[in-house]
Amino acid sequence: MSAKDERAREILRGFKLNWMNLRDAETGKILWQGTEDLSVPGVEHEARVPKKILKCKAVSRELNFSSAEQMEKFRLEQKVYFKGQCLEEWFFEFGFVIPNSTNTWQSLIEAAPESQMMPASVLTGNVIIETKFFDDDLLVSTSRVRLFYV
């Protein structure tokens, strides 16, 4: 195992996504929240989110995470897949993570134009969000969450 692989394993071992919520960015109202560690690789996670989230112009995502390890440039790359085809890609950067810290990170996710939106009945169960967790260019973990609109 290379030093990079070992470093990625160390970071992942000490990393935990404690909770996450999604809010309507305009009203601040929480639409969904969960405490499952959605960063765990190797399993397909599931999230049941309300259909009305698709009507929001923007969604505010709040992540609370703990890290035993220091990270120089913690960042996420996310891809939204519909039936295996990538529809959207997002990039988020947190930056420096203090070792043995718990942090809350808020990000704004802008919705696709309404003309490009598919109905919840078509999307439900067919959307997977793939999240890659990085420390700068070092891939730490890849997780997948299947969305169900309820």
Curated annotation (Swiss-Prot):
Which terms in the Gene Ontology molecular function aspect does this entry carry? GTPase inhibitor activity
This protein's major location comes to cytoplasm
Output the Gene Ontology cellular-component terms: cytoplasm; cytoplasmic vesicle; cytoplasmic vesicle membrane; cytoskeleton; cytosol; photoreceptor outer segment membrane
List the membrane topology term(s): Peripheral membrane protein
Expression sites (tissue/organ): Detected in retina photoreceptor cells, especially in rods (at protein level). Detected in retina, brain and adrenal gland.
Task: List the keywords (alphabetical).
Answer: Cell projection, cGMP, Cytoplasm, Cytoplasmic vesicle, Cytoskeleton, Membrane, Sensory transduction, Vision
GO term, biological process aspect, one:
visual perception
| Renumbered residue ranges of the record's region Required for association with membranes | 144-150
Cellular location(s): Cytoplasm, Cytosol; Cytoplasmic vesicle membrane; Cytoplasm, Cytoskeleton, Cilium basal body
Q: What subunit structure does UniProt give?
A: Interacts with the prenylated catalytic subunits of PDE6, an oligomer composed of two catalytic chains (PDE6A and PDE6B) and two inhibitory chains (gamma); has no effect on enzyme activity but promotes the release of the prenylated enzyme from cell membrane. Interacts with prenylated GRK1 and GRK7. Interacts with prenylated INPP5E. Interacts with prenylated Ras family members, including HRAS, KRAS, NRAS, RAP2A, RAP2C and RHEB. Interacts with RAB13 (prenylated form); dissociates RAB13 from membranes.
Relate the protein's function as given in its record. Answer: Promotes the release of prenylated target proteins from cellular membranes. Modulates the activity of prenylated or palmitoylated Ras family members by regulating their subcellular location. Required for normal ciliary targeting of farnesylated target proteins, such as INPP5E. Modulates the subcellular location of target proteins by acting as a GTP specific dissociation inhibitor (GDI). Required for RAB28 localization to the cone cell outer segments in the retina. Increases the affinity of ARL3 for GTP by several orders of magnitude.
What family name appears in the similarity comment?
Belongs to the PDE6D/unc-119 family.
Protein's name according to its UniProt entry: Retinal rod rhodopsin-sensitive cGMP 3',5'-cyclic phosphodiesterase subunit delta
- What gene name is given for the protein in this entry? PDE6D
